[in-house]
Amino acid sequence: MEALVYTFLLVGTLGIIFFAIFFREPPKLPEASKSKK
């Protein structure tokens, strides 16, 4: 049962890191990069 929890945490951490890198550098919208708030 503990292995399942550790696996879930590992997948969750990898998912968070993946999304963080993906949203950090958007593949499109070069114009939005110019108009920064």
Swiss-Prot record:
Keywords: Chloroplast, Membrane, Photosynthesis, Photosystem II, Plastid, Thylakoid, Transmembrane, Transmembrane helix. Its main location: plastid. The chain crosses the membrane at residues 3-23. It is found in: Plastid, Chloroplast thylakoid membrane. One of its GO terms (cellular component) is photosystem II reaction center. It is a single-pass membrane protein. The keyword Transmembrane applies. InterPro entries: PSII_PsbT, PSII_PsbT_sf. GO terms for biological process: photosynthesis. Coiled coil: none annotated. Belongs to the PsbT family. Found at the monomer-monomer interface of the photosystem II (PS II) dimer, plays a role in assembly and dimerization of PSII. PSII is a light-driven water plastoquinone oxidoreductase, using light energy to abstract electrons from H(2)O, generating a proton gradient subsequently used for ATP formation. PSII is composed of 1 copy each of membrane proteins PsbA, PsbB, PsbC, PsbD, PsbE, PsbF, PsbH, PsbI, PsbJ, PsbK, PsbL, PsbM, PsbT, PsbY, PsbZ, Psb30/Ycf12, at least 3 peripheral proteins of the oxygen-evolving complex and a large number of cofactors. It forms dimeric complexes. This is Photosystem II reaction center protein T. It comes from Spirogyra maxima (Green alga).
